[in-house]
A protein has these predicted regions:
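C-terminal structural segments of small proteins and small subunits
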Residues: 53-89
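Generic secondary-structure boundary/loop-capping signal
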Residues: 2, 8, 39, 75, ...
Length: 89
């Protein structure tokens, strides 16, 4: 997900917000998260999240809930969300 960070004025401020989001997504939704792009931008962050599930519907629901949570609980504006899943077996 690509986020515009409204309150960040320095890279340090940005990293605090991004770290808080990643930690909350990990603990609340059991997602593996990382900042994957836009590392030098003060105003924008791109966070990637992943999970493994035996149900594509469950996986998509968890990711939708996580995106909604970020939008509702952090001073950010959502710019882009991309979902990709693979089925093995």
């Amino acid at each position: 997900m690509v986020l515009k960070l409204g309150e960040a004025s320095t890279i340090k401020d940005k990293r605090k917000v991004v770290l808080a989001i990643k930690d909350k997504l990990h603990h609340r939704y059991r997602l593996s998260c990382a900042e994957v792009d836009l590392l030098d931008s003060v105003s924008f962050a791109e966070i990637g999240a992943a999970l493994v599930s035996n149900s594509p519907q469950f996986g998509e629901k968890v990711l939708r809930d996580a995106v909604s949570f970020v939008e509702g609980h952090y001073p950010v504006e959502l710019y882009d969300v991309q979902t990709h899943y693979e089925i093995y077996g």
